[in-house]
Amino acid sequence: MVKGLEKFNELVESFANLPTIGKKTAIRLAYHLCINNQIDGMKLAHNIENAIRFIKPCEQCGALSENELCEICSDEERNKNILCIVESPKDILTLEESQSYNGLYFVLDELNEEKLEKLKQIILKLNISELIFALTHSINSDATIFFIEDKFKGLNLTFSKIAQGIPSGVNLENVDLISLNKAMNFRTKI
């Protein structure tokens, strides 16, 4: 770090603490905001403060929200019969960006009795008919799916999980064996 520039060094350190930001990028960002574009720097500081103060988890699903209920849970146009279970609010952002799903969500960031009871109450309250699991593929997620299926088998639900396989534009030589195996075993007719 540069001696005599404590504020600059603190800013660099703050940027470097963010995911995927290394020291060189942190220095570039700090320099840009302090020297090249101070107005954007002040705007960024204001936006960060507002986001930290006003964004919280939706009380129903756990998505990012500025209100008790997020826009998704409040939207009357959404299909209220299906519930997609995800691992984090970031997953909701990704699915929403894809515009491939129009139902509700539930963030299952940890598997405990409190979360399971909350999930059950939402299923009963909203008369959910299908649970879609959109979890990272792993042995743990498979066990979680099996556990939830078993726990809620008496609720007359359909259970499904998102398809897995080979991403678009990826050569077979670059695909891991588990994904390749799943893609072959769960292939679809054309």
Swiss-Prot record:
May play a role in DNA repair. It seems to be involved in an RecBC-independent recombinational process of DNA repair. It may act with RecF and RecO. NCBIfam families: recR. Residues 81-167 form the Toprim domain. It comes from Campylobacter jejuni subsp. jejuni serotype O:23/36 (strain 81-176). This is Recombination protein RecR. A zinc finger (C4-type) spans 58-73. It holds the Pfam family RecR_ZnF. It comes from the Bacteria. PROSITE patterns: RECR (PS01300), TOPRIM (PS50880). One of its GO terms (molecular function) is zinc ion binding. GO terms for biological process: DNA recombination; DNA repair. InterPro entries: DNA_Rcmb_RecR (IPR000093), Rcmb_RecR (IPR023627), Rcmb_RecR_Znf (IPR015967), TOPRIM_dom (IPR006171), TOPRIM_RecR (IPR034137). Belongs to the RecR family. The keyword Zinc-finger applies. Keywords: DNA damage, DNA recombination, DNA repair, Metal-binding, Zinc, Zinc-finger.
